Amino acid sequence: AASDVYKRQILTRVAKSHLRVGTFEYFASRQQWEDLKLLADFAIQRHFPKIRETDNHYLELLKKVASNQSILIANWMSVGFIHGVMNTDNFTISGETIDYGPCAFLDEYHPGKVFSSIDQNGRYAYGNQPSISSWNLASLAGCLIAFIDKDSDKANELATEVLENYSVDTNQRILDLMCMKIGLDGSKKNNQEILRNLLKLMMDNESDFTITFRSLSDILLNNSDNFLAQFHQKDEVSGWINNWKSALNLENKNVCLLYTSPSPRDRTT
């Protein structure tokens, strides 16, 4: 009846701000330089007030955004999160996840996985997220370039260095977090190769991303059934397990604790 009372609830997520790269592009595209400078100053005041004391706080703004986004993207990748619509309007200055969707977490592992029906060419596919974030950051750099240095060549040189460092740092962060999922140190080349071999096996066997990594801990408890169930190439996987165990012996860590501690809830912002 119309007079009946039903309990309902609303989940609201509040961001530190809704400033995005697209906000900067809006003013830059109209050559509204004074307004763009005011926006940059507000972003600094809102998110990074300490950099106002630096000699080149617009360059530092770019560096801070790069650092925050690098951490965010690496965490996305490590838990199999696909944002879905990574255009500049959804790329925050604060380094938070907003306006995601159609978003999802990976089921069967594949770098080209998309969940958005409008993303026909896979621009925002899981494996493309680091490069798309770099593209978005370059767009922000283009908006700030006139404020970074009056000498355009010098400004471009400084911005390019930030972008190059971003790509290197992000790729290493992804390796570190992904290697952590298998109990290994991501800075070691051999461990990186072991990770890549596992991901190749997962792709070829259409293995579930989360279940595969989670079931690795069972192997250390002498139960490999859950892990092996994710693969039909049993011989290749058995060889990988042997290589992985050899690498683990060199790490000398409490690997079971590492496996059970990280979770998507704790590691995405």
Segments (PLM) and residue ranges:
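Conserved small/polar residues in nucleotide/adenosyl-binding loops
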Residues: A2-Q9, Y259-P264
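Catalytic-loop Lys-Pro-X-Asn motif of eukaryotic-like protein kinases
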Residues: T88
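Regulatory N- and C-terminal appendages and interdomain linkers associated
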Residues: Q120-S261, R265
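Ala/Thr-enriched low-complexity intrinsically disordered regions
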Residues: T268-T269
